[in-house]
Amino acid sequence: MRTATITRETKETQIYLTLDLDGSGRSEIDTNIGFLDHMLTLLAFHSDFDIKLTAHGDHENLGMDPHHLIEDVAISLGKCINEALGDKLGIRRYGSFTIPMDEALVTCDLDISGRPYLVFNADLSGNQKLGGYDTEMTEEFFRALAFNAGITLHINEHYGKNTHHIIEGIFKSMARALKQAISIDETKVGKIPSSKGVLRAN
């Protein structure tokens, strides 16, 4: 089974996360940030991952912004994806998906390469706050996820006006691309999808 669990506790955040890559899109998400909960629920649904997440951060009682929590949730999710994939035998490795979200169009391309990298081209300046969520943290979320999952990730907004729609398109396209990339290629069962024989940096 391709599953992973992480408990991450720091002076800034307390996070418990379980992940099943071969689930049915079920989720129980509680970060105390409504918009982030909504996006992670969409990520689970469109990737068919089962995700159970409870997260608390210093923004709840110290008057901090939720920067630490958002980044640490992404770190935890990335680590779980990497752990659950294990040796990556037989996976398709690559994923690409474009999502039209009303007036916005967003594409996510990724490679589970073991060489983490992020290209992020999206203009989220139209609305800097969505509830308790700082929209500028979207790029930091996906950077932390990519670097901890070992993914080369390119996110491109082709066009869009509504910041909510653009971010939702990002999460949905990421989910669909991940679903493609982690799926098993029946012609490559038991094989590492790399001419080098490994999927990691160096």
Curated annotation (Swiss-Prot):
Belongs to the imidazoleglycerol-phosphate dehydratase family. One of its GO terms (cellular component) is cytoplasm. It catalyses: D-erythro-1-(imidazol-4-yl)glycerol 3-phosphate = 3-(imidazol-4-yl)-2-oxopropyl phosphate + H2O. Keywords: Amino-acid biosynthesis, Cytoplasm, Histidine biosynthesis, Lyase. The keyword Ligase does not apply. Its EC number is 4.2.1.19. GO terms for biological process: L-histidine biosynthetic process. It comes from the Bacteria. GO terms for molecular function: imidazoleglycerol-phosphate dehydratase activity. This is Imidazoleglycerol-phosphate dehydratase. InterPro entries: IGPD_sf, ImidazoleglycerolP_deHydtase, ImidazoleglycerP_deHydtase_CS, Ribosomal_Su5_D2-typ_SF. Pathway: Amino-acid biosynthesis; L-histidine biosynthesis; L-histidine from 5-phospho-alpha-D-ribose 1-diphosphate: step 6/9. It is found in: Cytoplasm.
